[in-house]
Amino acid sequence: MLYEKFEYNINNLVGNFGLSKIAIAVSGGSDSVALLYLANIWAEKNNIELFIISVDHNLRAQSKQENYYIQSISNNLKRKYYNLSFDHQNNFSNLQARAREGRYDLMTNLCLELDVLVLLTAHHEDDYVENFCLRLERNSGIFGLSSSNIHWYNNIQIIRPLYNIPKSELVKYLVTNKIKWFEDESNLSDKYRRNIIRQKLFKEENYIKAEISVQQLKTNKLIEDELKPELISAIGEAVKIFEYGFTFLDLVKFDKFSNEVKVQIINFLLIMISGQSRSARFYSIAPILKLISQNVNFKKTVHGCVITRIQNELLIYREFGKKLPKSKILLDKSVIWDNRFCITKNQETPDCVITYLSLEDYKVIKKQLDLKHLKNLSCKNHNAILFTLPIIKILEKVIAIPHISYYDNDMWNFEVSFAPNFVSRFTHFC
């Protein structure tokens, strides 16, 4: 019965992809171990190569045992297993969020190397209920309260085929088939708000969780049927994103959309332009929406971005000064800099560094820069935007600023594209 439910889910979620490969994230807990066995049956039935991935966060001694166990299962199932390691660098600030981001970075990068398009994760019905309660507690809007069984990360499709299966069914499946799993002791700690909510829900009657699930489904339906199409339409109609890493929002077109969608558009642009992975809080977006409604020009900094109104348009570009991007050595053919730009070299060069333009360097090359095109596109905000662009240096000398076709020598040839590592449950643009 459980497998039939799983099979129906995954076939609907995968659709007509015509997959020959698929990957699965396994931690050693009951949820992911059950998913592994279910996915293995499905993969065998459909002649699909299954890759098993685990990530050691190097925080618990037990994780080594879990990884050995997953490797043992993988060997028995004759599946390829990859054990990845997350380096927390002894920085325990905001660790849960950083570990999650690091985990997905590692897994999706491996998927790209393996030419795998889909990664399965073991989020089940109880997880969705807990998430809904957590977000409700944080006063999330309707987009925040919604959940998705499919989303994208690093151009890999993340699929959750256990979304309507309670944890109790997964545990029962493992017990019936005498399959071992590990309990993560951190799930018992009241240090995490999720665990407290989980314990409260455990004490409630089943109908309470059922009612929450119904509300979740209603929210999801509203998003899918009405608000998500409106959001995609709004982005297409009102937003212009430029290769220089800034954007203009047409406020006349923006005004016709619902408030929920307006919040999401601003959030969408702030994440993309800032290069950050986290969303802006509603309390930081609300004042911007209020200023927009007042029809006055303004200039504000929010979420690592400068937002300025110019008549009926909103210009958003990256804020520089407080948090400068790290320099990167261009060792391979291409590199991502500032989580926003992809720089590619088209010739062999000595080790060069991708960094930002300093005032000292600007003074040296100022008279050689042609900023007319950038000036026209950005409504005379070219000087501020120039300092947000990647430059290429060799031995402390600026040899190229590809965006404005500045090269100190004809032998250099670099390509640059605006390619933010943008993550959204509602939109995806490759």
Curated annotation (Swiss-Prot):
Compartments it resides in: Cytoplasm
UniProt keywords, alphabetically: ATP-binding, Cytoplasm, Ligase, Nucleotide-binding, tRNA processing
Record SUPFAM superfamilies: Adenine nucleotide alpha hydrolases-like (SSF52402)
Positions that bind ATP: 27-32
Superkingdom per UniProt: Bacteria
EC number of this enzyme: 6.3.4.19
CDD domains: TilS_N
Entry keyword annotation includes Protease: no
GO cellular component, one term: cytoplasm
Family statement drawn from the similarity comment of this UniProt entry: Belongs to the tRNA(Ile)-lysidine synthase family.
HAMAP family in alphabetical order: tRNA_Ile_lys_synt
Comment field on protein domains: The N-terminal region contains the highly conserved SGGXDS motif, predicted to be a P-loop motif involved in ATP binding.
Protein name (record): tRNA(Ile)-lysidine synthase
Organism the protein comes from: Rickettsia typhi (strain ATCC VR-144 / Wilmington)
Recorded name of the encoding gene: tilS
